[in-house]
Amino acid sequence: MALEQIKGKLVVSCQALPHEPLHSSYIMSRMAVAAMEGGAAGIRAQSVPDINAIAEACHLPIIGIVKRNYDDSEIYITPTMKEVDELLTTRAEIIAMDATCRKRPGGIPVRDLVDRVHEAGRLAMADCSTFEECRVAQETGFDMVSTTMSGYTDYSPRLEGPDFDLIRRCAEELAVPVIAEGKIHYPEDLKKAFECGAFSAVVGGAITRPQEITARFVKILG
């Protein structure tokens, strides 16, 4: 089972959007293989082509998302049933989606998306920004919650690093697994996330976005 495979372990997010230098399904598949060889237990990936390429290249469980913008909503991570259905054509064992309290495109209830995921025999992951959103996600039927959106909504704290308080509170008060994700820049951040009670953790930019890694080094030079 995908959840057991990532328990206590690192998931690496391999994503590059069209405006980024490494945008290529082939490159993302090689990035996933490199992550697997480094000891990653799972991969988080964006778009059907990337997920399919990664699934062919490595055997790790995949957390799948589709990022798409809509005019009537700020939500862009697996926002509608269209994106869910696209992901269900892939091998992604876990389907992640924005579960913030913001209005979804078309006003579709997030519960409908979760139900579709479960009907297909997959797991649903809630990308949240606050404890209340994580609590509601658990009640809605999500199989796990993540702290992905903390700092990316108008009403969540703006932090330089991970939202450790959110990770800790979710781990203490919720029954579903808590996935630490967002601004995990250093190995020490990862260690602390697990000390706060994270079930698993996702690291992206610090591993797979060379432009961000380079900028972090350049910043030190002033």
Predicted regions and their residues:
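A C-terminal functional module that forms or caps the active site or interfaces directly
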Residues: 165, 173, 177-178
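Glycine-rich phosphate-binding active-site loops on the catalytic face of alpha/beta enzymes
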Residues: 15-17, 66-70, 90-104, 144-157, ...
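Glycine-enriched alpha-helix->loop->beta-strand junction motifs that scaffold or abut catalytic
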Residues: 39, 58-62, 90-94, 119-121, ...
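Conserved N-terminal beta1-alpha1 strand-loop-helix module at the mouth
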Residues: 1-89, 124, 132-140, 144, ...
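Conserved hydrophobic beta-strand within the GNAT/NAT acetyltransferase core sheet
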Residues: 97, 124-126, 178-181
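Solvent-exposed alpha-helices and their adjacent loops that cap or buttress functional pockets
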Residues: 1-5, 88-89, 116-118, 169-173, ...
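Glycine-rich beta-strand-to-loop/alpha-helix junction loops that act as flexible
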Residues: 179-184, 202-206
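Active-site-adjacent beta->alpha loops and helix N-cap segments on the catalytic face
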Residues: 21-25, 44-63, 74-82, 99-117, ...
